[in-house]
Amino acid sequence: MVPTQVTIFSIIMYVLESLVIIVQSCTTVAVLFREWMHFQRLSPVEIILISLGISHFCLQWTSMLYNFGTYSRPVLLFWKVSVVWEFMNVLTFWLTSLLAVLYCVKVSSFSHPVFLWLRLKILKLVLWLLLGALIASCLSIIPSVVKYHIQMELLTLDHLPKNSSLILRLQMFEWYFSNPFKMIGFGVPFLVFLISIILLTVSLVQHWGQMKHYSSSSSSLRAQCTVLKSLATFFIFFTSYFLTIVVSFIGTVFDKKSWFWVCEAVIYGLVCIHFTSLMMSNPTLKKALRLQFWSPESS
């Protein structure tokens, strides 16, 4: 059982993190949209970042609505909000994975024909990749929609004995189909992310070794170190976010209700840090943040 003080502290942290994520999302979309208005073009990475900003904005508002609406009374009145939350979560995973793929294609030094072809076609492919992410996210929530309909049916069958064959069949569908499919929905984009990060890390380490062998300038080596550190941060926080989401879905390791707000504070704290690292990795967003918070020094 979690102490009341810890629960209250977790709720306060969750609300503050939610506000920060909403501000981050609005800033990302506003800055990059202004960039598009000025230059009438955006890079594939910036297109994904705008999509991530919109996704995080919707995800956070949905999360707050669902958490405060159903925590005290876990009735299925908000099941549609829960489905939207899950959809936005899976979409966020796919968009982050696409971002890792873009970084891998753009930065890696592999000379395989597939990488060369992707570098040439990536600008045309990015919209198709976004469409694919939307379709995959929609498909991944189908079992959850069925699951919530099943739970609604179970509420109407309270008059039946607990060991009724109909109730048992409905519960078996939920446990043996819905939950594994949900894990697949989160696992596939994470696997894509993992493969992209591994390939990119291997490429950067090889390139770094070549630069040291040929006695490249210290500034170039420092730049490579900075990229590797950013990559490590990207990997650590997104992996932590994935594992925390998985544990919160399983909910069998601990008393899920008593640890609910602690889990939410941890999850969205990781989201906040991860999104900050993404913003700081983009030159346009980084420049806008510096002008916003350190304008006297930058001028």
Curated annotation (Swiss-Prot):
SUPFAM superfamilies, A to Z: Family A G protein-coupled receptor-like (SSF81321)
Gene Ontology process terms (BP): detection of chemical stimulus involved in sensory perception of bitter taste
Keywords assigned by UniProt, alphabetized: Cell membrane, G-protein coupled receptor, Glycoprotein, Membrane, Receptor, Sensory transduction, Taste, Transducer, Transmembrane, Transmembrane helix
Compartments it resides in: Cell membrane
Glycosylated residues in this chain: N163
GO molecular function: bitter taste receptor activity; G protein-coupled receptor activity; taste receptor activity
Topology within the bilayer: Multi-pass membrane protein
Residue numbers on the Extracellular membrane side: 1-5, 66-82, 147-183, 255-258
Membrane-traversing stretches: 6-26, 45-65, 83-103, 126-146, 184-204, 234-254, 259-279
Cellular component terms per the entry's GO annotation: endoplasmic reticulum; external side of plasma membrane; membrane; trans-Golgi network
Description of how the protein assembles with itself and partners: Interacts with RTP3 and RTP4.
Function description: Gustducin-coupled receptor implicated in the perception of bitter compounds in the oral cavity and the gastrointestinal tract. Signals through PLCB2 and the calcium-regulated cation channel TRPM5.
UniProt record similarity statement: Belongs to the G-protein coupled receptor T2R family.
Note: Several bitter taste receptors are expressed in a single taste receptor cell.
Name the record gives this protein: Taste receptor type 2 member 16
Organism annotation: Rattus norvegicus
This protein's encoding gene: Tas2r16
